Design a protein with these regions (language model features):
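Hydrophobic, well-structured mid-protein blocks that either form specific transmembrane helices
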Residues: 94-140
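Cytosolic, membrane-interface loops and tails of multi-pass inner-membrane proteins
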Residues: 1-2, 51-66, 117-133
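Lipid-exposed faces of alpha-helical membrane segments in multi-pass integral membrane proteins
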Residues: 14-20, 40-43, 79-82, 104-108, ...
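C-terminal membrane-associated helical module and adjoining short loops/tails
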Residues: 127-195
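Topogenic membrane-insertion module of multi-pass membrane proteins
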Residues: 1-52, 176-195
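Transmembrane alpha-helical segments that form the membrane-embedded catalytic/substrate-channel core
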Residues: 48, 107-120, 171-186
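Multi-pass membrane catalytic core of lipid/isoprenoid biosynthesis enzymes
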Residues: 11-16, 57-114
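Helix-coil boundary and interhelical linker segments in multi-pass alpha-helical membrane proteins
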Residues: 24-39, 79, 83-104, 149-166
Length: 195
């Protein structure tokens, strides 16, 4: 019997590295080092893109281990793709009443989406197993691509305009988290074979 609660095997390592990267992103954002904040957010997204494949490589997972994996992945995703982007945007300048309400709404939509995913995934695991082929709505991990791409605009836009445009961007992404539309999951094996 283990002296620690939880499940400890290689299947959770990338999830924990993703969390570590997201927390690092928040630290860098709070210090005004936005380049490294975005870099670590992207690293978090990269880890999240591959953690499912790592999990599926372990064939002898218990039902408790599977349930733990679903929960720990979503909890880490909430910090990585809910809190870290909101913290980044706050320190960049999405502030004031409107900005704070938008960031609150963004975090709320991320947590709703992740909780809904947990319910659907637990049901799906009992009936189907394997990898899911579609998302319901925009996955929270998408912010680790959307936000860095948007940040490229800071090199061509005045700072006040860049910050002003972050407001509707985060609002739109939040709505896309909870809007129910099918999004085909990218097949990483096919993507990597075409590179």
């Amino acid at each position: 019997m283990s002296r620690f609660i939880g499940f400890y095997d290689y299947t959770v390592i990338l999830t924990y590295v993703s969390l570590l990267a997201a927390v690092s992103s928040m630290f860098y954002a709070s210090q005004g080092n936005f380049f490294y904040a975005i870099l670590f957010l992207m690293l978090s997204g990269l880890c999240d893109a591959f953690d499912g494949a790592v999990v599926r490589s372990k064939k002898d997972r218990t039902e408790e281990g599977k349930a733990f994996g679903i929960q720990i992945d979503s909890l880490c995703d909430l910090i990585s793709f809910g809190m870290a982007p909101a913290v980044f945007c706050f320190f960049v300048g999405v502030d004031g009443l409107a900005g704070r309400l938008i960031l609150f709404f963004y975090c709320l939509c991320a947590v709703i989406r992740l909780a809904y995913f947990n319910v659907l995934e637990a049901q799906r695991q009992q009936t189907e197993g394997g990898a899911n082929k579609y998302y319901h709505g925009l996955p929270v991990t998408a912010i680790s691509i959307i936000l860095p791409l948007f940040c490229l605009l800071q090199h061509v836009l005045p700072e006040h305009l860049f910050v002003a445009l972050l407001h509707p961007l985060m609002l739109a992404v939040a709505f896309l988290f909870i809007l129910d539309f099918p999004v085909k999951k990218p097949n990483l094996r096919n993507i990597l074979s075409n590179v």
